[in-house]
């Protein structure tokens, strides 16, 4: 296993409450290209692809808006997505591309084949909900086919944490809004099965099954949507600190530092100019909760 003494020793200290970055996560990635082994850099790419998923959903929902958006993907190529989809529809040989296999599988199973069906046209509710269902399906493919099977315990555990957070919040929201949680829970382990069926406050999960279930329940009970997001990021930050405490010069420390930069970046970008865009992203992540919560947040933003 490679050790990165010089790189890690030279990293500036950062904290969860920081509002100023020593450098951007994107610049950090470029520097790491020259430092990490090819195998370790691939682990970084696995983490980076999680962010790219939302750009793919945006593109599938409205290619024109996605292409014109201010924020653009760093890894995903819209042109490659278009050419791969065209090849899938025509049944021709794939052009050269850099898309991960999970995205190819997703496009084939849930986009191209769906375009060939007409049964959505008569169901307005299904048409309206389809982008959200696509998001869930893409998350399923990302975690189960790409991130969780990663040959690195840290990457797999981090992916499990994020999947658990996503699923727990989906379960809470489904219960609150009268939705069927089976439509929104990703995965089919014993934990996911309990989230799909249990009506208990903690969904019948013990701390042995999910060590942070009590913390997530506490976060969910917070009514202020921005404070809730902040609590989640603190939970993630502390998780990262604990996981790399005894791995001082390993790649896991570098991966954790990258993820912590991303956490700080998300909050430094929350200003008057980008507040609404970030707000919409937060709402999408939380499964588009009740209009009352949304209106309350918007009123707070104007103060």
Model-found features: residue ranges?
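Extended alpha-helical surfaces
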Residues: 1-303
């Amino acid at each position: 296993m490679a050790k990165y003494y010089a790189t890690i020793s030279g990293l500036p200290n950062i904290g969860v409450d920081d509002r100023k970055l020593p450098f951007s996560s994107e610049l950090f990635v470029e520097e790491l290209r020259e430092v990490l082994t090819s195998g370790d850099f691939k682990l970084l790419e696995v983490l980076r692809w999680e962010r790219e998923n939302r750009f793919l959903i945006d593109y599938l929902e409205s290619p024109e808006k996605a292409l014109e958006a201010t924020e653009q993907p760093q890894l995903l190529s819209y042109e490659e997505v278009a050419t791969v989809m065209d090849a899938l529809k025509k049944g021709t040989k794939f052009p050269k591309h850099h898309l991960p296999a999970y995205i190819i599988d997703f496009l084939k199973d849930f986009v191209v084949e769906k375009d060939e069906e007409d049964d959505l046209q008569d169901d307005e509710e299904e048409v309206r909900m389809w982008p959200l269902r696509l998001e869930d399906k893409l998350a399923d493919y990302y975690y189960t086919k790409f991130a969780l099977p990663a040959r690195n315990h840290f990457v797999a555990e981090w992916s499990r944490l994020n999947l658990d957070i996503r699923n727990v919040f989906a379960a809470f929201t489904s219960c609150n809004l009268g939705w069927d949680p089976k439509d929104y829970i990703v995965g089919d382990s014993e934990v996911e099965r309990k989230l799909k069926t249990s009506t208990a406050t903690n969904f019948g999960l013990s701390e042995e099954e999910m060590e942070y279930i009590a913390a997530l329940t506490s976060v969910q009970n917070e009514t202020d949507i921005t404070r809730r997001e902040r609590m989640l990021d603190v939970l993630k930050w502390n998780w990262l600190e604990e996981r790399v405490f005894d791995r001082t010069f390993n790649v896991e420390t570098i991966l954790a530092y990258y993820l912590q930069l991303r956490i700080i970046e998300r909050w430094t970008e929350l200003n008057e100019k980008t507040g609404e865009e970030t707000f919409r992203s937060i709402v999408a992540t939380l499964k588009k909760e009740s209009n009352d919560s949304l209106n309350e947040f918007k009123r707070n933003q104007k103060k």
